[in-house]
Amino acid sequence: MPNHQNMLDNQTILITGGTGSFGKCFVRKVLDTTNAKKIIVYSRDELKQSEMAMEFNDPRMRFFIGDVRDLERLNYALEGVDICIHAAALKHVPIAEYNPLECIKTNIMGASNVINACLKNAISQVIALSTDKAANPINLYGATKLCSDKLFVSANNFKGSSQTQFSVVRYGNVVGSRGSVVPFFKKLVQNKASEIPITDIRMTRFWITLDEGVSFVLKSLKRMHGGEIFVPKIPSMKMTDLAKALAPNTPTKIIGIRPGEKLHEVMIPKDESHLALEFEDFFIIQPTISFQTPKDYTLTKLHEKGQKVAPDFEYSSHNNNQWLEPDDLLKLL
């Protein structure tokens, strides 16, 4: 089976939200390790696109100013594209709670627009990025991403004559991504803050590096049948240990859980254990619906064999068997 380098050779790839942390890392990896024909960055911010164009300076890159809320613009941008990575989202949990309709327009209606445009343009493969907050959601952001996941999974059933395959990749917090807690804590340290705010001493989170996230998406392109949700096996970390790693000499202050926050995140809920398959370094959540063409998710397209998990299995950040200590996080940074 070809590796992702060969698989992307001579392919045109479009990434929505391509100027974000994931998008920039994804584009860099594809440019550096493949002979992709063209990479199209589709996003709203002209300044970020201008800065990215100067930073990367590669003739294979194209930039489209556009919003995923704009179906007509997406249809135009996706002409001649082979692979679409959907990374655009409004993802800030408290802001989504205060601006729910805006979050719904981008994360749900935007997802629907991406699906429709990909079907119209007969895109070969589509992967949508999801989040651990989509499992058992208690906040609006997580609920919109759950809706998005359902839309992408079900798209495999109404594709008609198109051969488009839609899959989802779900993972946890990305170490150092824009707007995340790591740069926030770092800035507090730089500004010589007298204390580091912690919402709850029990809080845990899943963690993955940007490079690991990008590699997992590229590997999922090789593995996918369409309709599955890919979940990597990644470590957890206590938020108190995160504070110790980044600010070992600064006291912490418990400020209480923010709107929409959970104590622990879940990537595979117990109620979905009957759908989960375990592989060496990842899981697959099989779709709840059946498709016109049956798919055997126990065997990936890389011929990796999966096994059913235990009936009461739950993949949560607090019952994980992989843990990051403060020194481990510093190595990742």
From Swiss-Prot:
**Which keywords does the record carry?**
Lyase, NADP, Nucleotide-binding
PANTHER family with a match to the protein in the record:
UDP-N-ACETYLGLUCOSAMINE 4,6-DEHYDRATASE, UDP-N-ACETYLGLUCOSAMINE 4,6-DEHYDRATASE (INVERTING)
Record carries keyword Translocase: no
Its recorded reaction(s) are: UDP-N-acetyl-alpha-D-glucosamine = UDP-2-acetamido-2,6-dideoxy-beta-L-arabino-hex-4-ulose + H2O
Identify the residues that bind substrate. Answer: 91, 173, 181, 199, 258, 261
A Pfam family annotated for this chain is: Polysacc_synt_2
Q: What does this protein do?
A: Catalyzes the first step in the biosynthesis of pseudaminic acid, a sialic-acid-like sugar that is used to modify flagellin. Has both C6 dehydratase and C5 epimerase activities that result in the production of both UDP-2-acetamido-2,6-dideoxy-beta-L-arabino-4-hexulose and UDP-2-acetamido-2,6-dideoxy-alpha-D-xylo-4-hexulose.
Q: Which cofactor is essential here?
A: NADP(+)
| Disulfide-bonded cysteines | none
Annotated active site residues, numbered on this chain, are 133
Q: How does it assemble?
A: Homohexamer.
List of residues binding NADP(+): 19-22, 43-48, 67-68, 87, 91, 129-130, 141, 145, 174-178
The catalytic activity of this protein is classed by the Enzyme Commission as: 4.2.1.115
Its recorded name reads UDP-N-acetylglucosamine 4,6-dehydratase (inverting)
Record keywords: Transmembrane included?
A: no
Task: Tell me the SUPFAM superfamilies matching this sequence.
Answer: NAD(P)-binding Rossmann-fold domains (SSF51735)
Ranges annotated as spanning the membrane: none
GO MF assignments = lyase activity; nucleotide binding
User: What family is this protein classified in?
Assistant: Belongs to the polysaccharide synthase family.
